[in-house]
């Protein structure tokens, strides 16, 4: 017999009167035309900091095309194992003005090409055991803290520019001051409510040229930056740099 409590799975052997406790690391993947429908190229979404195994929120920033033949699906494993879900398998909510979801032959698609922050909420319930809500938000990335002059809010003056295509880089404004770099997304619903939670629950940095997400971990090692430098992020390749 197995039960899940929070982030742990407990397996009980009644016959031998033993038990085993194993930490569970729930995941979510996105596959579609933008990943060539190849699970080896699928985007692994980032878990919010306070997820549990049965309920949680996951996010990623990705570029997708518009309409038919540009669809995508999600799954909790990187495989065609029957757990994947598309247009009919989730509640779809757009928080982007003028952008709507469309049915691409059972796949999820949007009616305007571009960069989006995709947010998937997994909730225990429903006929299959889980319900899913797929959200889209504008892909807002912010500089927080010392390097923007000490601000700890969603300041539009400290928002990254968004590239025109899938190969481009998100670029920060020139940093205002020397200090520890803090980067995050902080998606808000159409009603202005925090979708994930506080900014640190969806923060990230980069090390050795690779974007590294905090996810469910603790404080990350610090990256120090100089005034005048800019941050460059490529969410397609996962590469990043500071110069």
Label every model-predicted segment.
Residues 1-243:
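Insoluble glucan recognition modules
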